[in-house]
């Protein structure tokens, strides 16, 4: 109440919003009603040093046409429909030339123009919670995380593996998991506080081509933390695999062995 007296304009809209307060409950009810299980214990709760789980679930199959149209639209006096029809008639060779010319001058710290935001990628990541907290700092994207849980196992840091301390690491994590399941029977929300940063969290995220340049440059370098570097390398491999032509002029600090461009 004192806040309302001192800074009334800052907290003018701080009242409870019933729609947002009830949205999560409605979604949980829908999942259960249509028999989508909300949680099951993992059969093997140790993910160890395995490869990150990354899936490219959707990508823009008209991306080349959309990007070329966006690049030509800005300084044209034609409607978008007219630009689109002409871009289709240009053929793939001309469209690729337009894209290449638009990225040829990119420096190591430059971002592509806004036109590159018209192409989207949707990924599903299974990241350890520490990596997830780093990942969500990138704001030019949408992300939909599932609740924190121990059901997807945990990531053992490579340095722990190299030191031969896997057993000690597991012995440290297991009690937290045991208590998690007990607390969850009483309060699923409270149980989430028992999830360690090593435990995996599943998230679906969508980001555009422009953001992918920034994300891949920053998070695939050798200086990046391993827990986010590995999944970002895999995400980049998947994106480049379906649309290599978009990444021809992407400037990386460290190129992976599979990089398709000279």
Descriptions of predicted regions:
Residues 1-262:
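A conserved ligand/cofactor-binding region detector
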């Amino acid at each position: 109440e004192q806040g309302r007296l001192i800074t009334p304009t800052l907290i003018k809209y701080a009242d409870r919003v019933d729609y947002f307060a009830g949205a999560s409950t409605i979604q949980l009810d829908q999942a259960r009603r249509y028999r989508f299980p909300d949680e099951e214990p993992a059969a093997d709760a140790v993910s160890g040093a395995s490869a990150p789980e990354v899936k490219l679930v959707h990508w823009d199959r008209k991306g080349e046409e959309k990007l070329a149209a966006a690049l030509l639209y800005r300084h044209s006096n034609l409607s978008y429909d007219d630009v689109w029809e002409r871009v289709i008639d240009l053929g793939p060779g001309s469209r690729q030339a337009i894209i290449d010319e638009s990225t040829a001058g990119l420096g190591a710290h430059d971002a592509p123009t806004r036109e590159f935001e018209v192409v989207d990628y949707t990924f599903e990541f299974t990241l350890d919670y520490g990596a997830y907290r780093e990942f969500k700092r990138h704001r030019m994207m949408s992300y939909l995380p599932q609740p924190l849980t121990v059901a997807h196992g945990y990531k053992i840091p490579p340095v722990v593996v190299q030191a031969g301390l896997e057993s000690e690491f597991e012995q440290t994590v297991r009690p937290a998991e045991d208590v998690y399941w007990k607390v969850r029977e009483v309060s699923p929300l409270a149980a989430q506080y028992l999830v360690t940063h090593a435990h995996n969290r599943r998230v679906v995220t969508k980001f555009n081509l422009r953001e992918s340049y920034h994300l891949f440059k920053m998070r695939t370098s050798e200086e990046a933390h391993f827990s986010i570097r590995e999944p970002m390398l895999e995400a980049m491999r998947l994106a480049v695999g379906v649309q290599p032509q978009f990444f021809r002029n992407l400037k990386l600090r460290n190129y992976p062995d599979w990089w398709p461009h000279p």
